[in-house]
């Protein structure tokens, strides 16, 4: 582990020093407490979920890259946040959404979470619903193509929408899907992007 989450590992630094300087820094600690702890109800128990080291630093870097990518000089490409299986991707997505929604530079963005299967859409939507308090708003699942278009077109700011890739298929006779908005702060999060995204 390193103090700032970078790959520049300093072997001469004591582990305790890394923890104190890297986690008990006022800005980092407050950030962690605000955006990286969630609570889930499991039967009759309340379970606390906390982001791990890789999630905390990964989400912070992803938010920073998103701010740059959506700025006037940005290219609109926020990047890829890759996880191995079972390493907390869904919770990282929740933390990213929570932090991004509250980031002043993003001007109350709209998030569109895209999956390539209905079961994944339902599963991820449920994870976000469980963490509604952390997100400070209720996620919405689009029912169909027209529903998604209406929701995005009528939403000037904010909102977390779930949909599947199939809803972006062009209408019969069209070669491209129509532009839904010219806003710079609509962020698309593609789950399992390696299966359906390219370019």
Identify what each model region corresponds to.
Residues 113-115:
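Short beta-strand-centered segment that lines the nucleotide-binding/catalytic pocket of NTP-utilizing
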Residues 98-100, 146-149, 173-176:
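A generic local structural motif
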Residues 143-161, 179-180:
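Conserved motor-coupling elements within RecA-like helicase/translocase cores
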Residues 118, 140-150, 165-170:
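Conserved helicase motor
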Residues 1-110, 119, 123-134, 156, ...:
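ATP-dependent helicase/translocase motor core
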Residues 158-192, 196-199:
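Conserved RecA-like ASCE ATPase "motif II neighborhood" in helicase/translocase motors
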Residues 135-141, 195-196:
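Acidic/polar loop patches that form or flank catalytic/metal-binding clefts of enzymes
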């Amino acid at each position: 582990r390193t103090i700032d989450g970078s790959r520049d590992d300093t072997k001469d630094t004591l582990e305790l020093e890394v923890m104190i300087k890297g986690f008990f820094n006022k800005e980092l600690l407050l950030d962690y407490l605000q955006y990286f702890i969630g609570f889930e109800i499991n039967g009759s128990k309340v379970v606390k979920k906390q982001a791990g080291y890789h999630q905390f630093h990964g989400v912070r870097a992803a938010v920073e890259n998103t701010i740059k990518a959506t700025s006037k000089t940005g290219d609109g490409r926020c990047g890829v946040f890759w996880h191995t299986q079972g390493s907390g991707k869904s919770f990282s997505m929740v933390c990213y959404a929570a932090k991004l929604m509250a980031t002043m530079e993003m001007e109350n963005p709209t998030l569109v979470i895209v999956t390539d299967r209905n079961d994944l859409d339902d599963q991820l939507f449920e994870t976000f619903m469980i963490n509604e308090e952390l997100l400070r708003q209720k996620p919405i699942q689009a029912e169909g193509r027209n529903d998604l278009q209406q929701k995005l077109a009528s939403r000037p700011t904010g909102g977390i929408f779930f949909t599947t890739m199939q809803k972006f298929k062009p209408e019969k006779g069209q070669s491209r899907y129509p532009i839904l908005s010219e806003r710079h702060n609509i962020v698309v999060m593609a789950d399992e992007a390696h299966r359906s995204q390219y370019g």
